Amino acid sequence: MSVLTTRAPAKINLTLHILGRRPGDGYHALESLVAFADVADTLELVPGPDLTLDISGPTAGPAGPLDDNLVLRAARHLAAGVDGLRLGAFRLHKQLPVAAGIGGGSSDAAAALRLLAELNGLALDHPAVIAAARATGADVPVCLDPRARMMRGAGEEIGPVLGLASLPAVLVNPGVPVSTAPVFKALGLAVGQRLDGAELPVVGASLNADAVLAVITPARNDLEAPALTVAPVIGEALALLRAQAGCRLARMSGSGATVFAIFSDDGAAETAAAAIRTAEPGWWVEPTRLA
């Protein structure tokens, strides 16, 4: 069989409400409207007898030890759940920043599961594929089929595809990796404690851009304030986005440090991205669309 290829797009939390910390397992209960960008890593699978991984690309350096990479972890979980699973050599081209709040590693892991499922004739809703996604990480299940939807619980409750309008946007990462743990520590919730705040209204399917903005603008990312104490440069990135013509909303994604802004149109997004690259040449800046 020839080489199999798929994209692993950036996952953007348009909203991220932390509802509390669950008494049973200590995980943070969340509610998030997730969309995916058209900027992505690329993953290839060359069928073969051995499970291997090679990483290249501009952000390959910070991706961590190969053996601990989520691509291999996901593949091993699936192999443990499916007798005789056909394997092969993965080639990952990293374009997305690491530890950036956009689910790069989780999206890579989900991409690995998609390729292995294709190679082995498994549906993405096959119990072994779902189990492998959940075992690999909380954000992996929502990345299996990267289209806008709600996620709840600790990430394991995935809603139906919403078919939202594609939104012109700019992603900005100020070049500072931010681990999730210190951000949740700064949030400071004790086990069993709930966080006050309005829940997101029901998000309907097939909303146009104005309707999507009407839903997400009153919402929030509850990790933004604690992340600003961990990496204050996030605030600078948000301010720079908000200062651009045509910016309709700017917010942090995940636990940071990537921030995003929704713009009035693609031209405004591209102009803003160019201006930010000029102002901050060391930052990762990408005009994109979210859907």
Curated annotation (Swiss-Prot):
Pathway(s) of this molecule: Isoprenoid biosynthesis; isopentenyl diphosphate biosynthesis via DXP pathway; isopentenyl diphosphate from 1-deoxy-D-xylulose 5-phosphate: step 3/6
Keyword Iron-sulfur listed: no
Binding site for ATP: 97-107
SUPFAM superfamilies associated with the record: GHMP Kinase, C-terminal domain (SSF55060), Ribosomal protein S5 domain 2-like (SSF54211)
Origin superkingdom: Bacteria
Documented EC number(s): 2.7.1.148
Record-annotated active site: 11, 139
GO molecular function ontology, one term from the record: 4-(cytidine 5'-diphospho)-2-C-methyl-D-erythritol kinase activity
GO term, biological process aspect, one: isopentenyl diphosphate biosynthetic process, methylerythritol 4-phosphate pathway
Pfam family, one: GHMP_kinases_C
Keyword vocabulary terms for this entry: ATP-binding, Isoprene biosynthesis, Kinase, Nucleotide-binding, Transferase
Signal peptide: none
Similarity field: Belongs to the GHMP kinase family. IspE subfamily.
Function: Catalyzes the phosphorylation of the position 2 hydroxy group of 4-diphosphocytidyl-2C-methyl-D-erythritol.
Entry-linked PANTHER family: 4-DIPHOSPHOCYTIDYL-2-C-METHYL-D-ERYTHRITOL KINASE, CHLOROPLASTIC
Protein name as annotated: 4-diphosphocytidyl-2-C-methyl-D-erythritol kinase
Organism in which the protein naturally occurs: Methylorubrum extorquens (strain CM4 / NCIMB 13688)
